[in-house]
């Protein structure tokens, strides 16, 4: 698929898309520049940190260097310093290979894009100029024809006038002949201009603009490929320093393992052993005459409980009223504001995302079940009851995700049927609509009342729910509202219908409708419009899909 064939009439769309692609390229270059600044700042801060904590005295004058802990710390700082050097290499590599090269490439792409669109606009201007010339020749031809007709009428009138002189009649005939000749020349000029414009228009739509669009497509694909390679440079810059960073990390590990606590104790003994004898016992001194008053228990303060009250109040504030007002996003949740093909793609993405989340939750549920079995068999490893809240939460998530999957599957099926119906519409777009049925449509109000009474009858026959059974929380609210009749299918209007007679409803070509009642053999079908309104339309004007 190429732009020149599929997007032949989307000049502005291609202009915006190619501009967006270049903006994305510039955005990535800017991101890498800031990433380079972060890496440079990170390396600089690491080096400053190492310099701050390195011993200030030489090793021979520093007694602490004899401890393995200090030696390991110094070695650790040196490895961090080497690590900072590798971050500087990453920043340098990204600055050269991404910032400089991609910025230069972006400028080249902008110049190429500008050239292609200038060429396209010139072609459009030439076609518009040709159309203006065609209109001028057409108006001239029309004007000359009127003048020729007027001159012919004048000559005929003078020829029949007995009071007119022969010279006047002859002059009028010559004038009529001249006007007729001028009209013939204008006709030939108009025909030539029309032929030239049709040739230029065919060349414009079938050759010139498709070539320009194909060039734009090639340019955009090259830009996207180069941008993808630029994305990969981030990981390549990291992979280049991974071996050295691995050695730095290995050095840190060796430094950590080289700490010898026993030897450090011996070093401390050797450095600070005094050699003095331990002091002897002290003699008893009696001070029993001095009695210290023991403070009473009543002097001790007790907490007033206010923190607990505050905690309780904060917990109460943390609760949310379940019937609070929520932002309604139902209108755009099914992406119905998008074109059918775009809606299908977005719904497909949402469905795949929900399936991945569902699979993740199911895997987590299986893992929790296995862990619970292990706890039940080996109680000392853990309490099986402690896993119940997590298992219940996982089951709730699974049920919620299953409902969402079903919802998106239904929307996706509807969107796919709409896409297929729209494709079929393109084949029958310009065909003549069939004649509507000669019989009058049924009475829509009586049909609605019948269906409503039937629904009420069915609802009255439902048995009441027993105690102990699961009942929806909001049942009492649902009972206050009578649900409208559910559609039995979907349909698309193939032709435009005015709906001027009683009981009918108007519809536009390509409009999506809900099927409320099938054709009873009289040629009429009852439908409901998305924006409201219900009535009958000719069955032959619809493409129907039953649920």
From Swiss-Prot:
Residues 490-547 are annotated as: Interaction with WAS. Residues 486-547 form the SH3 domain. Expressed in adrenal gland, aorta, brain, heart, kidney, liver, skeletal muscle and spleen. The record marks 166 as: Mediates end-to-end attachment of dimers. GO terms for cellular component: cell cortex; cell projection; cytoskeleton; Golgi apparatus; lysosome; phagocytic cup. It comes from the Eukaryota. Residues 415-547 are annotated as: Required for interaction with FASLG and localization to lysosomes. Residues 293-483 are annotated as: Interaction with CDC42. It is found in: Cytoplasm, Cytoskeleton; Cytoplasm, Cell cortex; Lysosome; Golgi apparatus. GO terms for biological process: endocytosis; epithelial to mesenchymal transition; negative regulation of cardiac muscle cell apoptotic process; positive regulation of cell growth involved in cardiac muscle cell development; response to food; signal transduction. Transmembrane segments: none annotated. Residues 294-323, 420-485 are annotated as: Disordered. Residues 1-117 are annotated as: Required for translocation to the plasma membrane in response to insulin, podosome formation and interaction with AKAP9 and microtubules. It holds the Pfam family FCH. Keywords: Cell membrane, Cell projection, Coiled coil, Cytoplasm, Cytoskeleton, Endocytosis, Golgi apparatus, Lipid-binding, Lysosome, Membrane, Phosphoprotein, SH3 domain. Residues 431-487 are annotated as: Interaction with DNM2 and WASL. Residues 492-547 are annotated as: Interaction with ARHGAP17, DAAM1, DIAPH1 and DIAPH2. Residues 293-547 are annotated as: Interaction with PDE6G. Residues 441-451 have a biased composition (Low complexity). The modification Phosphoserine is found at residues 296, 298-299, 426. InterPro entries: AH/BAR_dom_sf (IPR027267), F_BAR (IPR031160), FCH_dom (IPR001060), HR1_rho-bd (IPR011072), SH3-like_dom_sf (IPR036028), SH3_domain (IPR001452). Required to coordinate membrane tubulation with reorganization of the actin cytoskeleton during endocytosis. Also acts as a link between CDC42 signaling and regulation of the actin cytoskeleton. Binds to lipids such as phosphatidylinositol 4,5-bisphosphate and phosphatidylserine and promotes membrane invagination and the formation of tubules. Also enhances actin polymerization in the vicinity of membrane tubules by recruiting WASL/N-WASP which in turn activates the Arp2/3 complex. Actin polymerization and dynamin may promote the fission of membrane tubules to form endocytic vesicles. The F-BAR domain binds the phospholipid membrane with its concave surface. The end-to-end polymerization of dimers of these domains provides a curved surface that fits best membranes with around 600 A diameter, and may drive tubulation. Homodimerizes, the dimers can polymerize end-to-end to form filamentous structures. Interacts specifically with GTP-bound CDC42 and RHOQ. Interacts with AKAP9, ARHGAP17, DAAM1, DIAPH1, DIAPH2, DNM1, DNM2, FASLG/FASL, GAPVD1, LYN, microtubules, SRC, WAS/WASP and WASL/N-WASP. Interacts with the ligand binding domain of the thyroid receptor (TR) in the presence of thyroid hormone. May interact with CTNNB1 and HD/HTT. Interacts with PDE6G. This is Cdc42-interacting protein 4.
């Amino acid at each position: 698929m190429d732009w020149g064939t599929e997007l032949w009439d989307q000049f502005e769309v291609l202009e915006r898309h190619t501009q967006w692609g270049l903006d994305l390229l510039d955005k990535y270059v800017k991101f890498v520049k800031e990433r380079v600044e972060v890496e440079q700042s990170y390396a600089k801060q690491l080096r400053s940190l190492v310099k701050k904590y390195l011993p200030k005295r030489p090793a021979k004058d520093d007694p602490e260097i004899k401890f393995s802990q200090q030696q390991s710390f110094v070695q650790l700082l040196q490895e961090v310093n080497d690590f900072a050097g590798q971050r500087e290499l990453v920043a340098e590599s990204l600055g050269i290979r991404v910032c400089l090269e991609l910025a230069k490439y972006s400028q080249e792409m902008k110049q190429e894009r500008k050239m292609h669109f200038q060429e396209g606009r010139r072609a459009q201007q030439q076609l518009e100029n040709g159309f203006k010339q065609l209109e001028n020749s057409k108006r001239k031809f029309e004007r000359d024809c009127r003048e020729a007709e007027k001159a012919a009428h004048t000559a005929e009138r003078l020829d029949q006038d007995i009071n007119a002189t022969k010279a006047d009649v002859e002059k009028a005939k010559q004038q009529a002949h001249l006007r007729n000749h001028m009209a013939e020349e204008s006709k030939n000029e108009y025909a030539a201009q029309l032929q030239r414009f049709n040739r230029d228009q065919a060349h414009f739509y079938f050759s010139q603009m498709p070539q320009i669009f194909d060039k734009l497509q090639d340019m955009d694909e090259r830009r996207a490929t180069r941008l993808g390679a630029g994305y990969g440079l981030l990981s390549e810059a990291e992979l280049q320093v991974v071996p050295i960073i691995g050695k730095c990390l290995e050095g840190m590990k060796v430094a950590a393992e080289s700490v010898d606590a026993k030897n450090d104790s011996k070093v401390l003994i050797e450095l600070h052993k005094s050699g003095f004898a331990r002091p002897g016992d002290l003699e008893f001194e009696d001070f029993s005459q001095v009695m210290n008053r023991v403070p009473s228990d009543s002097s001790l303060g007790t907490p007033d409980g206010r923190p607990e009250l505050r905690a309780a109040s904060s917990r109460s504030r943390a609760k949310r009223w379940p019937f609070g007002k929520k932002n309604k996003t139902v209108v755009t949740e099914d992406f119905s504001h998008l074109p059918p093909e775009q809606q299908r793609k977005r719904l497909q993405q949402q469905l795949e995302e929900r399936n991945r989340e569902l699979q993740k939750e199911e895997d987590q549920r299986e893992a929790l079940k296995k862990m619970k079995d292990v706890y039940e068999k080996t109680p000392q490893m853990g309490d099986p009851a402690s896993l119940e809240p997590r298992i219940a939460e996982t089951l709730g998530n699974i049920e919620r995700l299953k409902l969402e999957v079903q919802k998106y599957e239904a929307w996706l099926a509807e969107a796919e049927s709409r896409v297929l119906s729209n494709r079929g519409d393109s084949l029958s777009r310009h065909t003549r609509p069939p004649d509507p049925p000669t019989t009058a449509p049924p009475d829509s109000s009586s049909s609605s009342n019948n269906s409503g009474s039937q629904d009420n009858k069915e609802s009255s026959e439902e048995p009441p729910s027993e105690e102990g059974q699961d009942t929806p929380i909001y049942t009492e609210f649902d009972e206050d509202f009578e649900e409208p009749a559910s559609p039995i299918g979907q349909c698309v209007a193939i032709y435009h219908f005015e709906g001027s007679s009683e009981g009918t409803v108007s519809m536009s070509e390509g409009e999506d409708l809900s099927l409320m009642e099938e054709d009873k053999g009289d040629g009429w079908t009852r439908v409901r419009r998305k924006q409201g309104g219900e009535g009958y339309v000719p069955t032959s004007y619809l493409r129907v899909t039953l649920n």
